[in-house]
Amino acid sequence: MLMSTSHTTEPQRLFGRDVTCIHRRSGERTAATVTCIRRGRGPDHAMQAPPPGTLYTLTLQVHGHAELDTTVNAATPWDALTTTREHLEQHEWFLAIAAARRDCWPIQLPRRHEATTVAELSDRRVPQHWQGFLADADPNDIGTLAEQQHRYQIWLSRYDTTSGS
């Protein structure tokens, strides 16, 4: 059994890095900094939900576009990233990261609340390729949340499975 090394209630950085942010219509590109911090005690092991009161705070700073900067609190890192992406989509901006690719989804989420990887949804039932949320992605592969969710539902129905399989 994997045990968490952090039982502290001090904020703990889970991930963060500089990424590329792209405007859908104009094609403008700019750097953005994404950071995710856990506030509260983490789960006792990887397959357990964090204790009540644990929040994940994702901060986005888009260089040269302060109007896009946001800070989001959510129950999981994926929820925080999803809410951040929704905010950007309203302004026609997208993050060029693996977590925004149409063909990627965090299928381990129901069992691993702190998961920070996405799987490529290929023609196999069990994904073979995993990437960190913030891994660089080809701008041609990124899409809206709706496109990504639609692709995931097609993948689920192809294998007659439920989310979390």
Predicted regions and their residues:
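OB-fold (S1/OB) nucleic-acid-binding surfaces
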Residues: L60-A66
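Long, contiguous binding/interaction regions
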Residues: L2-T57, D69-V72, W78, T82-E86, ...
